[in-house]
């Protein structure tokens, strides 16, 4: 995504190290995944019940969005902490998928090696490639004028993100409208997605309070790579469960918009 190299130009690469709150956010993500899988297995869910829980699982198991670093920076948080956790969450996801998905979808045969290669490929495309571009832009003398211009443009990454978000949201709405199910069930999935989104942001912020990292931890647990969630739903689960992550895109960005508005208002009035 074009906004990530712009954002990573402002990262201090020496500070990309795991910190204590990363562990707790990761632990809670794993715990929530096991609770969702356990619920499916214990109640032997089938039909719409299984689709609903699979849509929830896809929203929990998927990694933190790379855009979380942009929002965190706009909210005055630590961009290095967020960038580091984005990498870590991708590996958590890679470990959980081959463990959990074969349990709820017997036809799914996901090996650890295959899963890790798929995740690593996506990590390289979404994170590693942009961060390498940013690193060379920052340290290569020929590109110093470009680097200085990017640093001066405080909102450049945010504008790229907003543009990308508009396209993704439009595609998501189209997919939801054409979903092969009843309106009532779509509304129910959307409402459950809203509750899940609020819960993940709230729990993340609660954990972050103990480390003075409310903004970062809330974004880490709440803002998800929903494009990846939709892909895993189509690839490994019932394709209809992709509606859950599709709705989650809308909810998480409404929450982000409210947080950005509140932060901007508070900053200008203080």
Which residues are covered by each model-predicted region?
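Alpha-helical transmembrane segments of multi-pass small-molecule/ion transporters
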Residues: 1-270
